[in-house]
């Protein structure tokens, strides 16, 4: 480890050795696409003194949180429910949920009495594609494209935006999957056998595990 500006710390050694086990926390280097998505989300949802987007940002500022979704179950300022994925885009474990809870308690507004931090329920997504041309390389790139689309578009189903409204289910459009396949360079044509139609995910449920089969 080397100080980038030794002149700012005249009493500190300019270099040192740190073992890997002594370094904790942190996250992998952010990709340009993830940075772009975060900046656009900030522009679309400027800080508003404790709205749902603010609490999503509070969580996404943690090293072990990649995405978060907040909703006020009763439509008022007194309660908040949050679902999130860890840094790997996977279901968080209890210790990660506890860290998120502690972090939000340190930043919550006084009127917020009840906070629920939830792990989404993974509903595996099974996809069957008849691909032309059908090569190993094209299969791999099609699978990667589908997973990238889901990372960008998918979310858990959420409670109603306001009392009296229906639940805000997440609807995965079949056309999104077909589009993700069609955009892969080298794909000439395909038939999407499964899913046969749009898929609906209720509160707390979302597609994370993706199984792509080729016929």
Model-inferred region functions:
Residues 3, 16-17, 81, 116, ...:
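Generic structural signal for residues positioned in beta-strands
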Residues 5, 9-12, 119, 123, ...:
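Intrinsic-disorder/low-complexity coil detector
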Residues 7-18, 109-120, 190:
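Conserved short beta-strand edge segments in small beta-sheet-based binding/regulatory domains
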Residues 1-3, 25-32, 76-78, 106, ...:
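Glycine-centered flexibility motif
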Residues 44-170:
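Carbohydrate-recognition loop of C-type lectin domains
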Residues 143-215:
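An aromatic-glycine-centered, glycine-rich loop/turn in mixed alpha/beta architecture
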Residues 11-12, 16-30, 64-72, 205-213:
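Short N-terminal helix-initiation segments at or just after the protein's N-terminus
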Residues 1-45, 49-50:
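Catalytic P-loop NTP-binding/switch module of NTPases
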């Amino acid at each position: 480890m080397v100080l980038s500006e030794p002149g700012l710390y005249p009493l500190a050694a300019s270099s040192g050795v740190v073992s890997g086990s002594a370094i904790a926390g942190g996250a992998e280097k952010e990709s340009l696409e993830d940075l772009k998505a975060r900046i656009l989300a900030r522009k679309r949802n400027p800080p508003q003194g404790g709205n749902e987007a603010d609490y999503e940002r509070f969580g996404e500022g943690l090293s072990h949180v990649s995405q978060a979704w907040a909703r006020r179950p009763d439509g008022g300022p007194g309660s908040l429910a949050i679902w999130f994925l860890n840094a790997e885009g996977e279901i968080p474990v209890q210790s990660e949920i506890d860290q998120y809870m502690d972090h939000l308690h340190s930043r919550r507004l006084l009127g917020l009495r009840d906070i629920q931090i939830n792990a989404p329920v993974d509903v595996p997504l099974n996809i069957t594609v008849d691909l032309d041309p059908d090569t190993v390389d094209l299969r791999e790139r099609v699978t990667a494209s589908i997973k990238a689309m889901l990372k960008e578009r998918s979310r858990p189903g959420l409670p109603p935006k306001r009392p009296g409204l229906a639940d805000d289910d997440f609807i995965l459009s079949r056309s999104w999957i077909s589009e993700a396949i069609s955009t892969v360079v080298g794909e000439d044509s395909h038939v999407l056998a499964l899913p046969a139609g749009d898929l609906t995910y209720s509160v707390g449920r979302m597609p994370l595990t993706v199984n792509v089969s080729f016929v």
